[in-house]
Amino acid sequence: MAHGDEPEEGEAYGEGYMAPPAHRLRAGTLLIANTNLFEPTFRRSVIFIVEHNDGGTLGVVLNRPSETAVYNVLPQWAKLAGKPKTMFVGGPVKRDAALCLATLRAGVSIDGVKGLRHVAGRMAMVDLDAEPEDIAPLVEGIRVFAGYSGWTIGQLEGEVERDDWIVLSALPSDVLTDASEDLWAKVLRRQPLPLSLLATHPIDVSRN
């Protein structure tokens, strides 16, 4: 069973939460870890899907800041990095590789712009070999990730069907959300009932 933004009669999120059809799994959407996903790497994680195609799925975890400053790794990009200006852990794959997302300014076009590749809406991938001065006028900010999360063909669909993930729409601000905010709860709170009730699920399950 897959999930989206609107509940549909006859399917459920976990225990009693209604779920819509599967076709919304695509680049630019969010994967929200369900409350039954206890694996430390992904517990209460919010993953932005960068690519979803016949080759599989690639995404980055938006709410796992590291203690490594962007300036210490990519000093030329530090000025554009959103607060906190640290590297984020995008996932368990290729932790020694950097991947960068940007939130575009409203109304800008990046057609023909070297160094930016549109993902969805106002979200774009940034080529870290590009010149930051060329990118700066077009973006509200960037987020740099160490590593990523990846799934082979059909693997993610299976995990969604197993209720490990809830698939929801992303807002441009999600990519740059400050680490001090609970992005997992924030995304759930903006959903319609009954899904928004999951935002009250305690971080420490022993308190439930």
Curated annotation (Swiss-Prot):
Signal peptide: none annotated. GO terms for cellular component: cytosol. It holds the Pfam family DUF179. It comes from the Bacteria. Belongs to the UPF0301 (AlgH) family. PANTHER family: UNCHARACTERIZED PROTEIN YQGE, UPF0301 PROTEIN YQGE. This is UPF0301 protein MAB_4928c. It comes from Mycobacteroides abscessus (strain ATCC 19977 / DSM 44196 / CCUG 20993 / CIP 104536 / JCM 13569 / NCTC 13031 / TMC 1543 / L948). The lineage of its organism: Bacteria, Bacillati, Actinomycetota, Actinomycetes, Mycobacteriales.
